[in-house]
Amino acid sequence: MVVLQPDPFLSELTSMYERSTEKGSVWVTMKRSSMKCQARLKKMAAKGEAVEYRCLVRATDGKKNICTALSAKEYLKFQASYATVLKAHMHALKKRERKDKKKAAEVEKIPEKAPKKQKKAPSSKKSAGSKS
């Protein structure tokens, strides 16, 4: 996994989104990380120092993995830039219209049926005037 600075990370993320426009996906994960060894964290906590947690941002398109680590101060600037990248590539999130193969086949096979003409039932009236 390649660890990048925030600006190169965003430019690489943009190229990942562009490659996956027609086919594919990009997964982005964010999580809190101390990025320091546990012994060092315990010493800092014992001294009463504030532990600075970093935000770890990872992205992958299934083939290439990139990541960056952000401090709390960098995070707000990064979030604004990241939102701009997402808005620029939202068109890839729209659902594509797909034809259902079964429904299309049924429509082609069954032509529209014309309404059936109803036959008149023979009248049960007897003619009273004719004798033969």
Curated annotation (Swiss-Prot):
Which SUPFAM superfamilies does the record associate with it? Signal recognition particle alu RNA binding heterodimer, SRP9/14
Disordered: region residues: 93-132
Protein localization: Cytoplasm
According to the UniProt record, one GO cellular component term is: signal recognition particle, endoplasmic reticulum targeting
User: Could you tell me which Pfam families the record lists for this protein?
Assistant: SRP14
Task: From the Swiss-Prot or TrEMBL record, give the protein name.
Answer: Signal recognition particle 14 kDa protein
User: What superkingdom does the record give?
Assistant: Eukaryota
Query: Which residues lie in Basic residues bias regions?
Result: 93-102
Native organism: Oryza sativa subsp. japonica
A Gene Ontology biological process in which this protein takes part is:
SRP-dependent cotranslational protein targeting to membrane
